[in-house]
Amino acid sequence: MAPVPPDDTVEIAVRTFIPSDAEGISILIRRNYDETYHKRFVYDPDAVRQANETGRIVSIVAHYYETVIGHFALIPAQNSSIAEIGIAAVDPAFKHLGIMNRMFDLLCTTARSMGRTGFYGEAIMLHPFSQRANLRHGMSETAVLLGEVPSTVEIEHRYKDTRRSGAMVSYLLFDRGERSLALPERYRAIIAATYERSKIPFHEAPPTTAAVTPPACHHNQALGIGSIIIDAPLSPQHLELTLVALMSETCAMIYADVNLQRFGNIEETIELLNRRGFFYAGVMYSLHGGEDYLRLQRKNTQNVDEEDLQCYSEFGQYLLGFILEDERRISRFG
């Protein structure tokens, strides 16, 4: 049975995870998402407990007396100094009491104490509320990932889409050291605007040469998406082999991450990706090995929502508009 909302908030406390929270977290996620949340381990209290004990996640918990009514987590990256934030939920009976804000504040403190240089979140675009919360805490929008959210996802039995929905990526960086970047001409202005909004100084690196190298790739079965990591110039043959491998996994979306700091001349790689159906998604800071990447995206299904995505800010709306226009542009390549 769902808890009864309080007359006041005195007994609502926010703290880091203790083992006895695990069962309440699983109950809360089920209450908010039913059985649709893609990180399946959150439905198993033992798995939640183990994930926290091993550092796979760092849970922030809100509780009312002995009942877990809120959850937010840091998900440390394996090969970077940043973390992802996610697995966010507040019991519907306790909405509008500032619980998410309190968890977010402790999340920031915890990330800093762990030595993380920042974090990012992917706000589901079925509603604008997570985007609003992220912006209020100083996060900056950098990308829109079309089709990342499966059509099976449902929030509070209210927010759902028959098509794959999108995610708005936002960052909060504690370390804003100057970057040396290779900016492709096609996307120079919007990448520069993204860095400026994030208050990250940069200068453009002189073009350099690098050997052609096969890209790495990854398949996320839970989300039905694939990713390509490109740290050196890309050949058409390597791209085709990678696409065939990911498409054989029935990836609905494929994201191509192009290193902005590793090799100086990326124009040919960007043109090759455009001709194979990849269009703009945005910038991902400190994504792999602590370096920044330009992310492009490719649709392998028409079941992707582009009309009803919710954007909270003007820049978010501008970013989505740019992405859709770039998709129309590359569609002319056939």
Which residues does each predicted region cover?
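Conserved acetyl-CoA-binding loop-helix of GNAT-fold acetyltransferases
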Residues: 90, 96-111, 121, 237-244
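A conserved beta-strand-loop-helix scaffold within acyl/acetyltransferase catalytic domains
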Residues: 16-92, 218-220, 232-236, 240-243, ...
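Short amphipathic alpha-helix that is part of the acyltransferase structural core
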Residues: 2-43, 53, 61-63, 68, ...
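Conserved catalytic-core motifs of GNAT/GCN5-like acyltransferases
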Residues: 122, 138-160, 279-291
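Conserved active-site tyrosine of GNAT-family acetyltransferases
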Residues: 130-134, 273
